[in-house]
């Protein structure tokens, strides 16, 4: 009897509260092999917190995360070697060169830098980093360090890639090159999850775009989906979804008979989610 293959990445009913405030509420995602999915949201929507939970950096209050059917809470090191990630600011050792930082990341993922040398060179050319490979990281701009972090996340050919606003600080040429690198990942069956604010760019790289608002996924947008209100205009679809969610929340507060303090608290909650 053959069963259905598990999702490459599955997030099931995740709840997180920080300082007593709910940050993620019943977050659920399922990504297949070869899929690129994006999460978009306003500042404070919970995007980075979601990625930290997915990568095991933050333990949820409820729910679980599965990589290829295995709970990350009990996954062995080999499972994590198949994951590449870049969350928040790119880390680098200031005294090491860009190349040495990339090699250090490759070793941390259990790969051999000599075997990935061609991949590093190819990715460096795609992101216009070649001329800075031998420069100490302390002398690199934030955008150039972002390129170093991206190559460090991708060079060992991971099965699952998780990236937080990966195009931040990248020049237009590098953005195009990065897009091609993500297509390589999904082309060989890898799975990609990214967050971002650049709507046009997300429609170019993602098969689906989840709208995260106040810790919940309130809509899933499929770029170029026929007949969808807003069509391919992701920005319009995004703000329509956010406005509808806020109006529904306000209506719920009013129908419950709660006083003005409850509405004030609801409005504050929109801006205080980490």
Label each PLM-derived region with a short phrase.
Residues 40-42:
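The feature captures the beta-strand-to-loop junction immediately N-terminal to the Walker
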Residues 63-74, 79:
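Conserved ABC transporter NBD signature motif
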Residues 55:
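Helix-to-loop junction immediately C-terminal to a conserved catalytic motif
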Residues 103, 107, 115-132:
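Conserved ABC ATPase "signature" region
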Residues 161-165:
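Catalytic Walker B motif of ABC-type/P-loop ATPase nucleotide-binding domains
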């Amino acid at each position: 009897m053959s069963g259905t293959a598990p999702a490459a990445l599955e997030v099931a009913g995740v709840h997180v509260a920080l300082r007593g405030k709910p940050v993620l509420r019943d977050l659920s995602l399922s990504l297949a092999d070869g899929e690129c999915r994006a999460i978009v949201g306003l500042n404070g929507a919970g995007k980075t917190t979601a990625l930290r939970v997915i990568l095991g950096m933050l333990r949820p209050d409820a729910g679980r995360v599965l990589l290829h059917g295995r709970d990350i809470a009990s996954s062995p090191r080999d499972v994590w070697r198949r994951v590449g990630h870049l969350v928040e600011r790119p880390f680098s050792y200031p005294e090491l060169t860009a190349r040495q930082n990339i090699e250090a990341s490759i070793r941390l993922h259990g790969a051999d830098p000599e075997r990935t040398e061609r991949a590093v060179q190819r990715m460096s050319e795609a992101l216009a980093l070649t001329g800075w490979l031998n420069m100490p990281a302390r002398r690199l701009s934030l955008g150039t360090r972002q390129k170093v972090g991206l190559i460090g996340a991708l060079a060992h050919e991971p099965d699952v890639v998780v990236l937080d606003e990966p195009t931040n600080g990248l020049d237009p040429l590098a953005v195009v090159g990065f897009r091609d690198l993500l297509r390589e990942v999904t082309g060989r069956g890898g799975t990609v999850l990214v967050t971002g604010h650049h709507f046009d760019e997300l429609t170019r790289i993602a098969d689906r775009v989840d709208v995260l608002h106040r810790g919940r996924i309130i809509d899933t947008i499929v770029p170029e989906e026929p007949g969808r209100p807003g069509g391919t205009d992701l920005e319009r679809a995004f703000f329509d979804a956010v406005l509808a969610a806020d109006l529904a929340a306000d209506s719920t507060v009013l129908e419950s008979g709660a006083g003005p303090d409850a509405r004030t608290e609801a409005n504050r909650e929109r801006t205080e989610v980490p």
